[in-house]
Amino acid sequence: YEIGVRLVGSEMCIRDRGNGKSTLMKWIYNPSLVENYIEADGERIMGHERLGYLPQEMLDEDKEKTIYEYFSEEEIFWEKTPKELSVIAGKFGMKNDFFYSNQTMGSLSGGEKVKTQLMRLFIRDVSVLLLDEPSNDIDIATLTLLEKIINDWKHIVLFISHDETLIERTANMVIHIEQIIRKTKARYTVAKLPYRRYVEERLHKFEIQKQRALSDRREKKIRDEKYQRVMQSVQGALRSCTRQAPSVAKNLKDKMHTVKAMERRFEKEDENMTQMPEQEEAIFVKLGDENSHIPAGKTVIEYELSKLVTPDGKRILAEGIHLKIKGSEKICMIGANGAGKTTLLKKIAEELLNRNDIKAEYMPQTYEDLLDLDVTPVDYLDKTGDKEERTRIRTYLGSLKYTPDEMEHPIRELSGGQKAKVLLLRMSLSGANVLILDEPTRNFSPLSGPVIRKMLREFPGAVISISHDRKYIEEVCDKIYQLNPNGLQLIGD
């Protein structure tokens, strides 16, 4: 696609998954990062700006470094006074001696990784922040800090995000990149509007265009039916015309020329007919049915754990954990990064997946833990090998905006959002009445978010989840538990 944007003192948000957003951001930062796999025909006019880039994933080589080694790579780090470093540490809620720690970068929690990388950009005194999914894998406290950093930044912030709350509270301009017409055409929109106004205006324009397109098609149907009646009448008269009535035949032939001219005019009119609007957002399948409902009095799980320890068994994360879920309750566990939420959810999943009185399905935070990456989505979802079953699966995948080509490619080649859709479809097809979800919305675009939340809110069974998505917590969950060293505490009901 072609895109041209002038960045002048505005925060921005690039949205919708799988459309080259990260590639575009890398190209803006440093074209050499993407020259091996894309061809870019354009120019970067940077002026005197100093760019700072936060990648979506920390580089593997950086994970091996100690925190001290990571900061020491910046020459300007050695020019900073202890007071200046103390101010930077304070902004991020870190201790003054954090810069000199021998802890490896890879051992930091998700929130600590984001903070550390941002602190390095602050030390570098950059003027422009380029942030690729900065809200991934961070807790709510760090999200609040990130919002403050973006809002307090005096110059340009260009960020990619799926977090609707973060976007609503920070962005004052939107760059929307999408692929339409079965992903054969790229389209981008630049709107100098806050996110919520952009969504409302987009929906309003969509509805107006849709109504015009429907009106055009109704008028076309009436016109075409009338045209067919005239055409059939003239053709019938010509067939019944005898050689003894040449004047009548001539009149009918003249009429036929007129009818043909009408046809050509109609074809030109049809070329200018209002097109049905297209949006990239996927249409999601329904989760559960009447058999997924769980009686209010039924105990789904009563789980007790004296000690929750890290997977390597070296550290106690929490003690005295107790969780009781009844009926079709939908609960969410929150907590600081590294508190042990995913570890606890895995243990709960192990118990529920082995039960015979319920049908549980699990969506891990790392999809590769469950997906077979070497098979196609159709093969992964097909449990019978029946031709009708495979046709049904393809129909469902099509409703999720998969192209025929994507349906037959190995899962490892799909985007994170496409992998998540495979797991959601698996849950839909399985007839599950208990869903165990680790960050269920993390790989969906902001425009897909409301659809996902509605789908989970209307699911008739129980939901046990982890999330830092504030809209998901507010709209879907009945109860909110916070995991801390003293166990699970109910903080919202």
Model-based region annotation:
Residues 1-2:
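Short, exposed "boundary/linker" segments that immediately precede the start
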Residues 5-6, 10-209, 293-493:
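ABC ATP-binding cassette signature C-motif
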Residues 77-104, 111, 201-315:
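Coupling and communication elements adjacent to P-loop NTPase active sites across diverse families
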